[in-house]
UniProtKB/Swiss-Prot annotation:
Protein name as annotated: Mytilin-A
GO biological process: defense response to bacterium; defense response to virus; innate immune response; regulation of defense response to virus
Organism listed in the record: Mytilus edulis (Blue mussel)
Repeat found in the keyword field: no
GO cellular component, one term: extracellular region
Amino acid sequence: GCASRCKAKCAGRRCKGWASASFRGRCYCKCFRC
């Protein structure tokens, strides 16, 4: 789902934190402490 894709994306960028939200069928992802 959205959260797992976001987590994998941020992990790939070596970010320590991440946050995701689904809105109107779209996945929004934000990576922190990269």
